[in-house]
């Protein structure tokens, strides 16, 4: 080890200690709510269908891009509340905010809808902030962000009409949807508060339950803080026939 490498690693000590405390706070949050911590395999014979995720091959199997499939098997086997910290692997995701190997926190509640999962997330983030002595707010890039729940919410329809001038829930264009999100929609979110984006076009959420009153819209949500995606959630589609039909579409 060179002296530069030694000094670089030594400087990480405060962040590593803070990271360990965050893990403790997250575990305490879920255990207080009767969640079971699990550890599922890192290799799998198949991966969840995600068009924008390229997996790493491991002989004839794949390194897990997420723990979703294994955790859903446990959920179906009768475990009602689960969480885990999982090492995940995705090709082509290297940059300022991405790495091909990263740790994902994933949790499930049997029968819970997407708004319940989002509420879990808001409460967990607030609990972490309190545990770190941050008094319900963080400072990022020199600006304060108030984490007090509930966080502001806006639907995909309203966000795109406001920032980009069109409604992707009635006229979905995947390329335009992605480009306008990065260039117009995300920059329109307030910086001083997190934002929860709700109710995605159904083609952008193939595993999510459709809203009963509008089949063009799926019960999916994503949360953003300081211009970064923090979490996503959706109401699970549990009808096998409908799922097969959605895949065919």
Describe every region a protein language model picked out.
Residues 138-163:
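Short, conserved secondary-structure transition motifs
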């Amino acid at each position: 080890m060179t002296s530069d490498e030694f000094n670089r690693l030594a400087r990480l000590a405060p962040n590593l200690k803070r990271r360990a405390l965050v893990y403790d706070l997250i575990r305490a949050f879920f255990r207080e709510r009767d969640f079971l911590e699990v550890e599922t395999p890192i290799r799998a014979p198949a991966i969840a269908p995600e068009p924008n995720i390229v997996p790493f091959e491991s002989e004839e199997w794949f390194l897990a891009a997420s723990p979703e499939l294994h955790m859903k098997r446990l959920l179906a086997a009768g475990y009602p509340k689960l969480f885990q910290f999982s090492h995940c692997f995705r090709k082509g995701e290297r940059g300022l905010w991405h790495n091909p190997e990263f740790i994902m926190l994933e949790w499930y509640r049997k029968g819970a809808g997407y708004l319940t999962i989002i509420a879990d997330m808001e409460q967990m983030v607030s609990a972490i902030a309190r545990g770190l002595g941050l008094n319900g707010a963080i400072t990022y890039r020199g600006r304060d962000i108030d984490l007090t729940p509930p966080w502001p919410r806006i639907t995909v329809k309203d966000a795109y009409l406001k920032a980009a001038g069109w409604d992707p829930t009635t006229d979905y264009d995947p390329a335009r949807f992605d480009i306008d999100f990065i260039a117009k929609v995300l920059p329109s979110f307030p910086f001083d508060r997190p934002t929860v984006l709700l109710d995605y076009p159904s083609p952008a959420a193939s595993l999510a339950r459709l809203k009963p009153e509008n089949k063009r819209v799926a019960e999916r949500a994503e949360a953003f803080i300081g211009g970064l995606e923090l979490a996503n959630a959706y109401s699970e589609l549990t009808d096998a026939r409908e799922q097969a039909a959605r895949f065919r579409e």
